[in-house]
């Protein structure tokens, strides 16, 4: 049996049950990971899945990493032998096995004695308004509507706002100065609404907003739930390493970015310093997954597994191994220069 399959077979949650089934029903299972696109006109990467000996079982997969697809009358011979038990230890992901055995061994050794993001912080998604353009106002719009500034809260609407080390009050002032729609209409249940707000809610925009799925399924519809002021923000999708940006201006954020709340006694400065290490860059690649177009996606459940500032004893050979591993993972998601 042979299939062309999405490259998500190397990391997606649904790939785990599939490969468990394959290993329990076929004597031979091989996955050919193809780095260059099988279908160049599509954003989807594709790999090949081959299985033989139905009715048998296998204790390992064969993963063949090939640069480009070319027709052959049989699967490639060369490959990495991936024990099913070891695959399970990597959260049932094949992507880490694109790395060399030395890189995987070093990663496991360092990660075993290091802190992960989930040990020092909680990572979650931001709020969902149901109608972003209605609930986020420009300063000029709020003034025109007569909405008081104390009802508007500075908000990070997407990852483009995550620049530098911190979002500061100067950042928020720049949003105001450039009349950007980065101010959430933050209303609370039980508070009497000013006349200007009632008029805004009853405007055509408000009548349209309340019909959206999220709005019509909450009471009252105009109170956006789960609005928090985190210690930091983490980019959801990134080109290189995900950005970890301190929140020095008490901003809130939509679900286009992750919100990070530090555990008691933790310092965002120390966390950012550790976040910038090469090993943490590698960990983001290993624990995250490619989205397409060269992007790396980091779900909350993946983010908490990221190893923070893992030490490799500063040996040059290990440093080179980590750097090469980062480059390898980025090439496989088409981010590295010249990889397209």
Feature annotation, model-predicted:
Residues 96-316, 320-336:
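Polybasic, glycine- and aromatic-enriched phosphate-binding surface used to engage nucleic acids
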Residues 339:
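Acidic, carboxylate-rich catalytic segments that either coordinate divalent cations
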